[in-house]
Swiss-Prot record:
InterPro entries: HAD-like_hydrolase_sf, HAD-like_sf, HAD-SF_hydro_IA, HAD_2, HAD_sf, PGP-like_dom2, Pyrophosphatase_Ppax. One of its GO terms (molecular function) is magnesium ion binding. Hydrolyzes pyrophosphate formed during P-Ser-HPr dephosphorylation by HPrK/P. Might play a role in controlling the intracellular pyrophosphate pool. Belongs to the HAD-like hydrolase superfamily. PpaX family. GO terms for cellular component: cytosol. The gene is ppaX. NCBIfam families: HAD-SF-IA-v1, HAD-SF-IA-v3, PRK13288.1. This is Pyrophosphatase PpaX. It comes from Bacillus pumilus (strain SAFR-032). Keywords: Hydrolase, Magnesium. SUPFAM superfamilies: HAD-like.
Length: 216
């Protein structure tokens, strides 16, 4: 496929469009310090970024999963507006893509309420025709279902789309759904961690996407 045939761009949210890393780390630290005082360092918490809260907390203690998720989300919402920012060139890139008629969507493992908080805070909400959240699917990334659902809602074929994300779940989900994939070099887990999963492209900044899809 020639990448100039791409007319649809799907984005992960956290760590891709908006910088929620410090919010996520603080939310995990707050929750884990309550249930497991002193047991988890910042470096260990980095491994929890990407999978759903259910997967992370149920692996620790199935009986406490719901309580831990509730504590995490309460803290996360309280601190949200203090700790969330957008990444460099994101807004300008989205403006160009929208002006050129690209179909834009978000595919995330967050719940819808929290997604909308971040989009409204950063002014990104108007750019997206479709937002697929954890509430909308039976299977989260890296399963292809979330990407497939977004493509279906946008009326796009996989070969016309690229999935952009900061985590291996994003790359694997896009690959399984048949799209091109792009990793972001500003991933908190590091560029090398994404290269292991062979994304088609690696973005040093979001505006690099414009040349890839023929919108530069």
């Amino acid at each position: 496929m020639n990448e100039s045939t791409i007319n649809t761009v799907l984005f992960d949210l956290d760590g891709t469009l908006i910088n929620t890393n410090e919010l996520i780390i603080a939310s995990f630290q707050h929750t884990l310090d309550h249930y497991y005082p002193g047991q988890y360092s910042r470096e260990e918490i980095l491994h929890f970024i990407g999978p759903s809260l259910f997967d992370t907390f149920s692996a620790m203690d199935p009986d406490l999963t719901d309580d831990m998720i509730q504590m995490y989300r309460t803290f996360n919402h309280e601190q949200h507006d203090l700790l969330v920012t957008e990444y460099e060139t994101v807004l300008d890139t989205l403006k160009v893509l929208q002006d050129r008629g690209f179909k834009l969507g978000i595919v995330t493992t967050k719940i819808r309420d929290t997604v909308l908080m971040g989009l409204k805070l950063t002014g990104l909400e108007p750019f997206f025709e479709v937002i697929v959240t954890l509430d909308d699917v039976q299977n989260e990334k890296p399963h292809p279902e979330p990407v497939q659902l977004a493509l279906s809602k946008l009326g796009s074929d996989p070969h016309e789309a690229v999935m952009v994300g900061d985590n291996y779940h994003d790359i694997l989900s896009g690959q399984a759904a048949g799209t091109k994939t792009a990793g972001v070099a500003w991933s908190i887990k590091g560029e090398e961690a994404l290269f292991k999963h062979r994304p088609d492209f690696m973005l040093k900044k979001m505006s690099d996407l414009l040349a890839i899809v023929g919108a530069d």
